[in-house]
Curated annotation (Swiss-Prot):
EC number: 2.2.1.2
Subcellular compartments: Cytoplasm
Matching Pfam families: TAL_FSA
GO CC, alphabetical: cytoplasm
InterPro entries: Aldolase_TIM, TAL/FSA, Transaldolase_3B, Transaldolase_3B/F6P_aldolase, Transaldolase_AS, TSA/FSA_arc/bac
Record's function text: Transaldolase is important for the balance of metabolites in the pentose-phosphate pathway.
Coarse class of the protein's main subcellular location: cytoplasm
Domain of life assignment: Bacteria
Active site: 83 (schiff-base intermediate with substrate)
Top-level EC class: transferase
Classification via HAMAP family: Transaldolase_3b
UniProt protein name: Probable transaldolase
Keyword Cytoplasm tagged: yes
Length: 217
């Protein structure tokens, strides 16, 4: 499973990229706006920190404008993936862009039919939103399982990015459900290596070693 960071904060990206465990980055207009800087500048900086895919979302709502934005965005760096919303206009754009060899990430996927349409349009990635679906009484992890089954059954190469990840449990469950990638907020990424029993075990080892050292004096 690949791990992407879901953030536009370059300091967070640098921090976690140093671990060698970050395979890519996803952004959206909300995340970029929080940085208070020019969109193009932020995206270009991110592409210089990580060599993997960096999703940059279009803001247009019409297919023609999405396509124009996408063609401009891919000029910024070779590892940019154009993020497209799951709408009828978005699907039109994905069909054209995929035909041009431009990688796309269809975002805001909440159903199997949406994911299937995106795959048929040629999307490189689809992003089902786990947390947001859970919020309305749905089951984000079940959606990932269902998407995995459909994509495999019909031979689509589209990869599943588990998005709207709320905690380590989502990451674990997405991996078990067959997601190719989890895109993870920095606050959640920093919790992945933590467990109360790990902390307890380390404290016990340290205490025992300290006691042993005292007997050697």
């Amino acid at each position: 499973m690949k791990f992407f960071l879901d953030t536009a904060n370059t300091e967070d990206i640098k921090h976690f990229a140093e671990l060698g465990l970050v395979d890519g980055v996803t952004t959206n207009p909300t995340l970029v706006s929080r940085e208070g800087r020019d969109f193009e500048t932020v995206i270009k900086e991110i592409t210089q920190i990580v060599s993997g895919p960096v999703s940059a979302e279009v803001t247009a709502t019409k297919a023609e404008e999405m396509i124009a934005q996408a063609r401009n965005e891919i000029k910024w760096a070779s590892n940019i993936v154009v993020k497209i919303p799951m709408t009828e206009e978005g699907l039109k754009a994905v069909k054209v862009l995929s035909g041009e060899g431009i990688k796309t990430n269809v975002t805001l996927v909440f159903s199997v039919s949406q994911g299937l349409l995106a795959a048929k349009a040629g999307a490189t990635y689809i992003s089902p939103f786990l947390g947001r679906l859970d919020d309305i009484g749905g089951n984000g992890i079940q959606l990932v399982k269902d998407l995995r089954q459909v994509l495999d059954t019909y031979g689509f190469k589209t990869e599943i990015i588990a998005a709207s990840v709320r905690g380590p449990q989502h990451v674990q469950e997405a991996a078990l459900a067959g997601a190719d990638i989890a895109t993870i907020p920095a606050t959640v990424f920093g919790k992945l290596w933590s467990h109360p029993l790990t902390d307890k075990g380390l404290a016990s080892f340290a205490s025992d070693w300290k006691a042993f050292q005292a007997t050697q004096k």
